[in-house]
Design a protein with these regions (language model features):
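Substrate-binding cleft of extracellular glycoside hydrolase catalytic domains
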Residues: 1-112
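Aromatic-lined carbohydrate-recognition surfaces of secreted/lumenal glycan-active proteins
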Residues: 109-126
Length: 126
């Protein structure tokens, strides 16, 4: 739905993470609008990616980077990893997920720098 970013800022919200991408092909159709409006309202913004168990980590990183581009002056990128669909009942292989997540984090780190992102992600993936 629509978000009134100015109202969110008035209510004391100082930052927002906005969904940009999912998997290796999906883009959130509201990302550009939400990003622009949240920044115009004076909020510090960060972009996040919804991790897919069906796509290679490197391809997901490439997709995210292509969509969001330069993130200077923004919050560090976030990768949202959670069980969805059939994986809620039958979780994916942990080692495969770790491998793909490490590849994604490595590519994001190469593009955006460490800034604590890698330390958190690597410890969480172990």
């Amino acid at each position: 739905g629509e978000i009134d970013w100015a109202k969110m800022k008035q209510q004391g919200m100082d930052f927002a993470y906005i969904k940009a991408t999912e998997g290796s092909a999906h883009e959130d159709k509201r990302f550009d609008k939400n990003w622009k409006e949240a920044k115009a309202a004076g909020m510090l913004c960060g972009a996040y990616h919804f991790f897919s168990f069906e796509s290679e980590g490197a391809k997901q990183a490439e997709h995210f980077i292509k969509k969001v581009g330069d993130l200077k002056g923004s919050l560090i990128p976030v990768v949202d990893v959670e069980y969805y669909g059939k994986y809620a009942e039958i979780p994916p292989d942990v080692e495969k997920v770790r491998k793909e997540l490490r590849e994604m984090v490595g590519a994001l780190e190469k593009k955006y720098g460490r800034n604590g992102f890698s330390d958190w992600a690597h410890s969480s993936a172990q």
